[in-house]
Structure formats: C-alpha cells, structure tokens
From Swiss-Prot:
Summary of subunit composition and partner proteins: Part of the 50S ribosomal subunit. Contacts protein L29, and trigger factor when it is bound to the ribosome.
Pfam families: Ribosomal_L23
Keyword Cytoplasm carried by entry: no
GO cellular component, one term: ribonucleoprotein complex
Protein name: Large ribosomal subunit protein uL23
Amino acid sequence: MNSSCEKIFGVLRSPRVSEKSSRLQEISNVYVFEVSSDATKVDVKNAVERLFDVKVGVVRVLNVKGKSKSFRNRGGSRSGWRKAYVRLIDGQSIDVAASV
C-alpha cells in the first residue's frame, strides 16, 4: 500500500449508519463518517473524493463528547470521537453498504 492510501484510511475510519444519517442521505445527499480526531475539513474532503471518486460540496466536522458510564458501581467514561457530515454535489452518490 502506498502512503496516500494509508493517509486516506487514516482519516476516514468508518461510515456512521443510523436513522438520522439514512434520512440525511436520502433527503440532502449528506453522508456521515467517523474520522480521525486530528482530521481537518480539507483532509476529509480529499479522502472522500479520492476514495469514492465523487465531488464533495461541503464538509462539516464536530467532536462527539464521550459519555459517562458506570459498571458495578465504578465510574468510567467512553472516549470521545469526531464525525464529519459530507455533502456531495447533486448527481453524485456513494454506496455506503458496499464500502463497509
């Protein structure tokens, strides 16, 4: 594997499939990905365009805070993660089920 492929797979971790992401995909042509915690909007845009061969319009990224959880009366927390909402240009699409 060359270094550019490693960088792409280092930025994009996995697609996030949920009711909200499915609805956004159908209505607004927006796809949701879990990305690396140090990934920028430009990194995500370049990775999606090169991996799926599509044109990206807008990228929005946000940090999801980890939840506090308890297990057998011991406190703990889940780690936080970063996700990206990627809007494609009209006429473009990604088959998320095949890419998983």
